[in-house]
């Protein structure tokens, strides 16, 4: 019953990366890297705090979670879980100035997984606002290994930024599996916590990139993370990464963000 509720629609702009996960039955058979580019995220939040609509738009395709059209969106401490009527899933979080998440579009036996970050406005020069800052938040993703079923993941995220020098350390902790259909906790995946140091990238002052790694079973998986700073006073950060083990058999696609 939505009687008496008001609705607020927000628009976020950002970037994404993607990977195809090819399935054999319920198990992962192979991976192939796909496109990256611009992301547009549209969301509608009800006055009771629930999210009724989220649309992720990219040149590679759109995915819509609309509770008025057969989808479900459930909120939990770290963000929201979306499921379409054909069971494509999403894990995402919307902060005041930024949003981040992962979502999938399934065609036949292939699930294209997207991870991305977006916001309402970028901080043009964070160092002019604050020389250093600490951020805390969450990470949301999907962990896959050839021969096994995919596992959706959540974690705690932290970042320590030195905007004056243009560096930022990032890490996750308490990585755990989660069922999108039930919200149940699936246990610890702490070996898939990530860490790394990012540096200011390109001609702007609000984009940071660098390598992040985890050390599952003493066999490191790594990838490039991209993070951006959002808000009029550098209130939040959001980023994403796709990590792959050297032999190509394990992959962790995740997004992350935090506020100060």
Residue positions per predicted region:
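Mature soluble binding/inhibitory domains
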Residues: 1-260
């Amino acid at each position: 019953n939505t009687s008496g509720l008001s609705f607020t629609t927000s628009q976020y702009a950002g970037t994404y990366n993607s990977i195809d996960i090819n399935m054999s039955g319920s198990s992962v058979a192979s991976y192939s890297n796909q496109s990256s580019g611009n992301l547009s995220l549209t969301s509608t939040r009800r006055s009771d705090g629930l999210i009724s609509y989220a649309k992720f738009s990219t040149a590679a395709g759109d995915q819509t979670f609309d509770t008025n059209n057969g989808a479900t969106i459930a909120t939990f401490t770290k963000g929201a879980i979306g499921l379409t009527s054909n069971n494509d899933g999403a894990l995402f979080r919307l902060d005041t100035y930024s949003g981040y998440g992962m979502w999938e579009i399934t065609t036949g036996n292939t699930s294209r997984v997207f991870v991305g970050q977006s916001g309402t406005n970028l901080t043009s020069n964070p160092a002019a606002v604050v020389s250093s800052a600490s951020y805390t938040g969450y990470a949301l993703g999907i962990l896959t290994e050839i021969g096994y079923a995919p596992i959706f993941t959540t974690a705690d995220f932290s970042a320590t930024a030195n905007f004056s020098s243009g560096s930022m350390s990032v890490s996750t902790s308490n990585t755990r599996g989660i069922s999108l259909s039930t919200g149940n906790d699936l246990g610890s995946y702490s070996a898939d916590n990530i860490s790394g140091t990012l540096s200011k990238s390109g001609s702007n002052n609000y984009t940071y990139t660098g390598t992040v790694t985890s050390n599952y079973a003493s066999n490191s998986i790594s990838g490039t993370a991209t993070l951006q700073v959002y808000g009029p006073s550098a209130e939040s950060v959001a980023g994403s990464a796709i990590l792959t083990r050297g032999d190509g058999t394990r992959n962790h696609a995740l997004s992350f963000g935090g506020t100060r």
